[in-house]
From Swiss-Prot:
Protein's GO biological process: proton motive force-driven plasma membrane ATP synthesis
Statement: the UniProt record of this protein carries the keyword Transport: yes
Gene: atpA
Organism the protein comes from: Methanopyrus kandleri (strain AV19 / DSM 6324 / JCM 9639 / NBRC 100938)
Protein name per UniProt: A-type ATP synthase subunit A
Binding site for ATP: G236, P237, F238, G239, S240, G241, K242, T243
Matching InterPro entries: AAA+_ATPase, ATP-synt_VA_C, ATP-synth_a_Xtn, ATP_synth_asu-like_sf, ATP_synth_asu_arc, ATPase_a/bsu_AS, ATPase_F1/V1/A1_a/bsu_N, ATPase_F1/V1/A1_a/bsu_N_sf
HAMAP family per UniProt: ATP_synth_A_arch (MF_00309)
Subunit annotation: Has multiple subunits with at least A(3), B(3), C, D, E, F, H, I and proteolipid K(x).
GO molecular function, one term: ATP hydrolysis activity
Domain of life: Archaea
Length: 592
C-alpha cells in the first residue's frame, strides 16, 4: 500500500472533509481519514488541497487529524463468493463485519469483500502454450449449484499461457495462471480481479435488445415489456408498491443473476428480502433464490455519502457477471435517494444548485449509470453474449412526476411503469397505470413473442389497450348519466374492460400461483377475454341484451383463470374458450 500522500484535515462539513498537504493525490483515490482511518474518496483537487467524500459517519473528527492516501481508486473485488453475499455501499460484507464487531458497524473497519481463506474447486479450460486474449475463460468454479463462475483473463492482458493450475482447490489469492505478453512480461492471474467502480467494464460491442426479460407479471410482460439489456423506471408515490414490484422482479425475472441495491430505503425492506429469498424457490432451477442474488444494502440509517457509491458498486458487480455471458438484472431501490445524496454532497461543496437544489450534473450522472445497462458481445474469443438490465425505482415527493429526478430518468430509460396511488387505494396491484405507462421495446420483442408464444400476440395486446382507453373515455359519461343510458355495445366495452383490469392486470404477489404467470398462460388468458368480447359483440348484434350476457357463469371461470396452476393452464383455459362458444350459442338460439 503506497502511503506517499499524507495531509491533515482543515475543514469538516458533514460527510465532506477538506485536507491540505495532499500533493500527488489522484481524483477518486481512496483515503483513510482521521485517527480512526475512515474510508473516503477524493472528489476535488485544488493545488495541495483535496476534498474528500467520507463514506462513514464523521462525528468526532477534528481539524488537524491526519489523512493518508492509499494510492488506489475506489474499487470492488470481483471473484467467486459474491453470490448470496450482502454488502454495504462500499462492498464490505455485513455478515463478516457482524462476526468481528457485533451488530453495529464500527467506523474505520476494513474487511475484505471476498473470503481469503475459503477454497474453491477450480477446473482449467486452457492448456499451457495456448494463446489467450482479454476476457478468455481460463477455468471455471462452481460458485453455486447452477452458476458456474468463469475465471477470465483480466482486461488489458493477453498473450501465451505459460502456467495453468491443475484441477484442485484454491483460494481467491492463489495464482491459477501465468500469461506472458508480447513484450515478454509475465502476468500472474488469480481468481480475483479488482475494478474501479466508476469505470464501466469493457466489451466488444453492444447488441440490439431483442429478447424480453420475462418477469411473470402480466401488466409488464404483455403490456409494457422490458428487453434483456434494457432500462426501466418505476416512479410512484409512497405506498403505491414500488418495493414490492422491485422484489417481484428480483424474484421472478428470468435473469441468471440478480443484483438488488437498497439505496437509502428502509432497513426492514432489505430484511424482508433477506428473509424471503432463501425460502423462495427459483421456478427455473428449483433452488433458493438467494443463490443467484447479490445484495447491496445501504439503508436510510447508513451514512449518506456511501449511497452515492453503492449504485456504482452494484453495477460493477453486475457487469462482471455479464462478462461471463450471463443475463443480469439490477434493481436499484431507490435512485431518488441516490440523487438526494448527490444533492447533499453538492451543497457541502458549495456548488451552484440547479433545479430544486439538485446539482446541475444530475442528468449526466443518471445517464452514466443507466448507460452501463445493455446487451453486449463480451470480451474473449468465444463471443459470449451477456446483458445487464437496469430497473430503477424513483420516489418523487408527493408522487409529483414533474420533479427533476423523474424527468431526467424518463429522458434516459425506455420503459416507464407509472405507479398510481389511486389504483393502490382501490387495492389494484400492481398499481401500474396503463394509460400513463409506456414501453419503447414493443417492436424489438414482438418477434420473440410471435415465434415463441403466439403469432397474434401484438394484435391482442393492442386491442386490449384500445379497450382500456375507450373505457377511460366512457367513464366521464357514466359518471354523469350512469351506465344504463349507454348503448348496449358500449356497456359491453365497459364489461370487457373490467375483465381486463380485474382478471388480467390485477395480480396477487402473495398468492402461490398468481405471483408468477408464465408468458404462455398470459397469452391464453388475454386471448380468452378477447374471444369472450368477440362472441358477446356477435350476440349483441343479434339482439341479446347485455344483462343476459352478464348472467353467464363462464364469466366466473374467466375470473378464476389466474389461479389455475401454471402446468394445467393451457388445457383448462382452452376448455373455458369452448365453454364460451357453447354458452353464447345457447343464448343466441334463445334470443332468436
Amino acid at each position: 500500500m503506497s502511503n506517499s500522500v499524507k495531509g491533515e484535515i482543515v475543514k469538516i462539513a458533514g460527510p465532506v472533509v477538506e485536507a491540505v498537504g495532499c500533493e500527488g493525490a489522484k481524483m477518486y483515490e481512496v483515503f483513510r481519514v482521521g485517527d480512526e482511518g475512515l474510508i473516503g474518496e477524493v472528489i476535488n483537487i485544488e493545488s495541495d488541497r483535496a476534498t474528500i467524500q467520507v463514506y462513514e459517519e464523521t462525528t468526532g473528527l477534528q481539524p488537524g487529524e491526519p489523512v493518508k492516501g492509499t494510492g488506489e481508486l475506489l474499487s470492488v473485488e470481483l471473484g467467486p463468493g459474491l453470490l448470496t453475499q450482502i454488502f454495504d455501499g462500499i462492498q464490505r460484507p455485513l455478515p463478516e463485519i457482524r462476526k468481528e464487531v457485533g451488530d453495529f458497524v464500527e467506523r474505520g473497519i476494513l474487511v475484505s469483500a471476498l473470503d481469503r481463506k475459503k477454497k474453491w474447486e477450480f477446473t482449467p479450460k486452457v492448456k499451457e502454450g495456448e494463446k489467450v486474449e482479454e476476457g478468455d475463460v481460463l477455468g471455471t468454479v462452481p460458485e453455486t449449484e447452477f452458476i458456474e463462475h468463469k475465471i477470465m483473463v483480466p482486461p488489458g492482458v493477453s498473450g501465451e499461457v505459460i502456467e495453468i493450475a491443475a484441477d484442485g482447490e484454491y483460494t481467491v489469492e492463489d495464482t491459477i495462471a501465468v500469461i506472458e505478453d508480447e513484450e515478454g512480461e509475465e502476468h500472474e492471474v488469480t481468481m480475483m480481479q479488482e475494478w474501479p467502480v466508476r469505470k464501466p467494464r469493457p466489451y466488444k460491442r453492444k447488441l440490439d435488445p431483442e429478447e424480453p426479460l420475462i418477469t411473470g407479471q402480466r401488466v409488464i410482460d404483455t403490456f409494457f415489456p422490458v428487453a434483456k439489456g434494457g432500462t426501466a423506471a418505476i416512479p410512484g408515490p409512497f405506498g403505491s408498491g414500488k418495493t414490492v414490484t422491485q422484489q417481484q422482479l428480483a424474484k421472478w425475472a428470468d435473469a441468471q443473476v440478480v443484483v438488488y441495491i437498497g439505496c437509502g430505503e428502509r432497513g426492514n425492506e432489505m430484511t424482508e428480502v433477506l428473509e424471503d429469498f432463501p425460502e423462495l424457490e427459483d421456478p427455473r432451477t428449483g433452488r433458493p433464490l438467494m443463490e443467484r442474488t447479490i445484495l447491496v444494502a445501504n439503508t436510510s440509517n447508513m451514512p449518506v455519502a456511501a449511497r452515492e457509491a453503492c449504485i456504482y458498486t452494484g453495477i460493477t458487480m453486475a457487469e462482471y457477471y455479464r462478462d461471463m455471458g450471463y443475463d443480469v438484472a439490477l434493481m436499484a431501490d431507490s435512485t431518488s435517494r441516490w440523487a438526494e445524496a448527490l444533492r447533499e454532497i453538492s451543497g457541502r461543496l458549495e456548488e451552484m444548485p440547479g433545479e430544486e437544489g439538485y446539482p446541475a450534473y444530475l442528468a449526466s450522472r443518471l445517464a452514466e449509470f443507466y448507460e452501463r445497462a445493455g446487451r453486449v458481445v463480451c470480451l474473449g474469443s468465444d463471443d459470449r453474449v451477456g446483458s445487464v438490465t437496469v430497473v430503477g425505482a424513483v420516489s418523487p415527493p408527493g408522487g409529483d412526476f414533474s420533479e427533476p429526478v423523474t424527468q431526467n430518468t424518463l429522458r434516459i430509460v425506455k420503459v416507464f411503469w407509472a405507479l398510481d396511488s389511486k389504483l393502490a387505494d382501490r387495492r389494484h396491484f400492481p398499481a401500474i397505470n396503463w394509460l400513463q405507462s409506456y414501453s419503447l421495446y414493443l417492436d424489438d420483442v414482438e418477434k420473440w413473442w410471435h415465434e415463441e408464444i403466439g403469432g397474434d400476440w401484438r394484435e391482442l395486446r393492442d386491442e386490449a389497450m384500445e379497450i382500456l382507453q375507450r373505457e377511460s373515455e366512457l367513464e366521464e359519461i357514466v359518471q354523469l348519466v350512469g351506465p344504463d343510458a349507454l348503448p348496449e355495445s358500449e356497456r359491453l366495452i365497459l364489461e370487457v374492460a373490467r375483465m381486463i383490469r380485474e382478471d388480467f392486470l390485477q395480480q396477487n404477489a402473495f398468492h402461490e400461483v398468481d405471483t408468477y404467470c408464465p408468458p404462455e398462460k398470459q397469452y391464453e388468458m388475454l386471448k380468452t377475454i378477447l374471444h369472450f368480447k368477440e362472441r358477446a359483440e356477435e350476440a349483441v348484434d343479434k339482439g341479446v341484451p347485455v344483462d343476459e350476457i352478464l348472467k353467464l357463469d363462464v364469466i366466473d371461470d374467466i375470473a378464476r383463470m389466474k389461479v389455475i396452476p401454471n402446468e394445467e393452464a393451457k388445457e383448462k383455459i382452452q376448455e373455458i374458450r369452448k365453454k364460451i362458444d357453447e354458452q353464447f350459442e345457447e343464448l343466441i338460439e334463445e334470443a332468436s
